[in-house]
Amino acid sequence: MTIRKMVALLLASVMALTVGVACAEMTPGTYEGVAQGFGGPVTVKVTVDAAAVTAAEITGEGETPALGGAAIEQLTTALVGVSDAAAVDAVAGATVTSTAVKEALAAALAQAAGEAPAADAALAFTAGTYTATAKGYNGPVEVSVTFTDSAIASIEVTAHKETAHVGDVAFAPMIADMLAANGTGVDGVSGATFSGAALRNAVNDAAEQAGCTNPTAFKTNTVAHEPQAAVEDTWDVVIVGAGGAGMVAAAQAAQDGNTVLVIEKNAEMGGNTLVSGGAFQSVMPYLVWDAADPDATTGVNPLDGQTYDKVKSDIGRIETLKTILGWSEEPFDGTIDAEHPFVAGDIGLNAVRGVHAEYLPVLKALKAEIQAYLDWAQPQLDAGVNETQLTVFSTMNLHIFQTYYGGLRPNADHTAWIYSDVDLVKQFVEGGQDIKPWLVAQGAKFDYARQFTLIGCLWQRENSPVGGVVDGVEYASKWGAYFMVPYNTMTKANAHNQLMLRTTATELIVTDGRVTGVKAVGYDGTEVTAHATKGVILATGGYAANIDMVQSTNEYWDASFIADNIGTTNRSSLMGDGITMAAAVGAATEGEGWTQMMPLGWVDNGNLAGGAGENVIYVNAATGKRYVDESAERDVLSEGAFENGMSKETAEKLGLKYVPGIYVEVSNTGVTAGPGGFNNLPEDVPGRMVFRTVEETAELIGCDAATLRKTIEDYDAYVMGVSDTLEVPKLSIQATVGDVEKDENGNYLPETYKLENLRVRFMAPSTHHTMGGVKVDVERHVLDADGNAIPGLYAAGEITSGNHAGNRLGGNAVTEIIVSGRAAAQAVNADNE
């Protein structure tokens, strides 16, 4: 749910405050000030007598409901009786909104005291060019602004680190509007809130340097975007959402000969996929153990005909396979009591519970595959060969079964369990085999040599996009492979095919019980009516950015973990719009009580930090000890962080914004966050990452240095094989924290071990993925409460339920969105043949 406008009003009779410092005597009346908030201008209108505020009204249209909205209500109360803005305390967790309120109040009080120009006073500047910076999503945004004596002449963003095609798309339209408005009170751009706010703040700073004579007017000056003539047209397929699932569906629909319209609320295609790691889970048979040629050390990739070295196993894979081999084949028993405890991520406990009937055939087939592998591997292990020298075991059945037990979870009060729909899981696991061939045929490029891990993925099964080539031009990474390539396929298939940006779908059109189109509105208010002769595909993503919705639907997490100020890895546009539209036409929903937390969230903004758990350790800042299996599922890691998070005092000492669950990641200095645009430079990043000695790290986080050193050395001893126990067990390990050499067979040489410098990161869980959503079948028809398909309506990607149950494996999302996007488009075509 989106609250467009929050207004709080309180009269003087409600309360009065005593403050320490007063302004000069004020002229009684009503005054207004404006300052930049998180999502747009915040306006404070106050009525004053000669000494203080007697009534206050605060308006902040763009502020986040759960944070800025709550702060506005609280601060409105606090303003009555105030005569000095400095006396108003900020609201915890809403610093940006609080600061805006105080600045706007100061401007209003200055007018009342005769110390500021009237709101309608003319603008004047000291002509010249000024440089200013403001904090963006990923770092400082620097601008160069040139003023005449009365207006902005030019604005140039001279440096920034905002995400390409996500944050940086705010700059051009907002700069154009600022120049036309001669001020910064212009509309932001959906999906780029942080970046737009940084641009506004930087331009405001430049105006202040230029001696702006009327800051209030400058910050409120805007342009009115008048609606254009209403748009009404017809396509075969209308798709809502231009993220990964939507653009894949568009390309498939176009390949099938359909005309296609894609409606996207943001200023560019990409959706949440563009801010994800981008890797997808799918076993590449030529890179893993082959029962038909068990001793092979290389394999041939059928896509390029080249030979590649097979991937070696991580430490601990054999033990996991043996646990699965011993998995009970009895019907699943969900009893949870003292004798049958539930511990998220403990597959040993789940193995004795049995298996749901739908997954029994998968388990039996997998056991046969595992037994064949162990018959080959065990003699080598018995002969002293290190596990890391063996080719890794990996099959589609393993992927299916790990998706099953990785998402098998009870609700918070242990009265019900949730698990994935086996048909949907089989669909995306098996369909994952065709992702590379299909996209490569259109121009995409992938890393063919690796099957790596990322956080919470459970196995070495990840694949990374390299980019894509369109008309001889190469586009990097996710943008190239997942967006420019399918966009090119769509647009070249038919001149009528279109991507409509900055346009928000508002409702589905239903004719005689069938969904026949979409109503939408452009950023300027232009009305759009898009008719679909064959079907509508919803690919709007989830709602992890809608903290209110996450909190209200929660059935899994301790409520205290989902604080109002929790971060999110999602773009601000991921609010659950598509689910709401689908429900309005009778769609059933399920599984919304399970929201995935991403343990690798930066503390300052919730953004995805990237990385894996097999090559790092997580440390409690107070004790200096490990507290969790870092290679476990994401909910396990997040719960561990919440339960072992640092104190507010420690966070503030480190200069970190306090949120629940801040923890310390420690690794070798050579570890990187992986592909996908993450910061992999070996340098300090304030508030995020530092490089320090063990002793310096201990002093920094406030733990005992000897304890921290022992924690790391004990862990490394286990990794090197010097010790056979860990205080906190770990299923899969790739590397030591300290430096150590290996012999030609890959065995560690403990005598070369040394522990000196560390790579240290500060992170906390962020909302990341909503596993629940609209109910669908394998053809991606949207189903009603009775299980019947709603004619003409399909859905793909995170908007749907049934794929991941209570916890999603890392990398499964991208696999699922690509496979389901294609499946939905193919179903539309098949249903209309």
Q: Each predicted region: which residue ranges?
A:
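An anion/pyrophosphate-binding glycine-rich loop and adjacent beta-alpha core
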Residues: 379, 579, 588-707
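A glycine-rich dinucleotide-binding beta-alpha-beta segment and adjacent secondary-structure elements
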Residues: 507, 707-803, 807
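Glycine-rich FAD pyrophosphate-binding loop
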Residues: 255-275
